[in-house]
Amino acid sequence: MREVYGVGDFRYEYVEGWGKLPEGIRYLECPGVAVDGQDNVYVLTRGDHPIMVFDREGSYQGSFGQTYFSDRTHGLYIAHDNSLLVADDGIHTIQKFSTDGTQMMELGARNQPSERWGGEPFNRPTSAAIMPSNGDIYVSDGYGNSRIHVYTGTGEYKHSWGSPGIDAGQFIRPHNIAVDDNDTVYVVDRECHRIQLFDPQGNFITMWNNIHRPDAMVLWQDHIYVGELNGMGGVDDAPGLGHRVSIYDLKGNMVCRFGAAEEGEGPGQFIAPHGIAVDSHGDIYVAEVSYTIRGRHMDPPRELRSISKYRRVSS
């Protein structure tokens, strides 16, 4: 009998072996994942094939992005027009691609970070999103800043907000960003265990607390899907701290959560969720930085599972 995870309208089964690769190609690990309007799945990796493309069933279609990125690719977002935004905190850029692999734009001075905590773009940016109503680009910046930056769709700088701290409108680590159809901007503030909501100018609206190290986030229909990272140093192996998926309505009410208390590579288990996507059927794809969190510390180091699919089950 198949095992089903979740509750009510949000019930899922693990898809064994989704995303098998051709001989000689490996993920290493997957910091991001996104799905286009045709249910093609784009997986961001830290291997030699930075952006891999699969069909919905998990058949490998090819890759692109070689020579464009460092080994610290970080966030992947797909916009309403199917363009892809890729954050690379190793070279301090946000790059925009078409789904055929053509680079369309690059924001940031490659390999020239701004002053750490200085507030100027960019110092290790984490993610970017596009506002559908006007095409503006919102960037979470990230590891060396506690800041949100806004650009026009043509790449002209507009304004920024945020500073280090725990008050409303401040961030410890803005790790992911999304924009809904009402122009509300959602920012994952990972180390504060919360998601903050803003208007397009950066005015604070509200915050949702008690979300364990939210790392990944995607809007789909009238819900937000969140991947939660494991515990921090000293409690990083504690059961029940993160390594799970949570689903919220747009008022911040949790409607579903799944993920075993113990981390792992089995069905229903996660190690380090870092990217999340949902296709037109409601199936969930979870990308993980399992090598960074666990695999590189093993003796000898080894690659761990870093992409998985959960198929939505009809009630």
Model-identified regions with their sequence ranges:
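Eukaryotic scaffold repeat domains enriched in small/polar residues
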Residues: 1-315
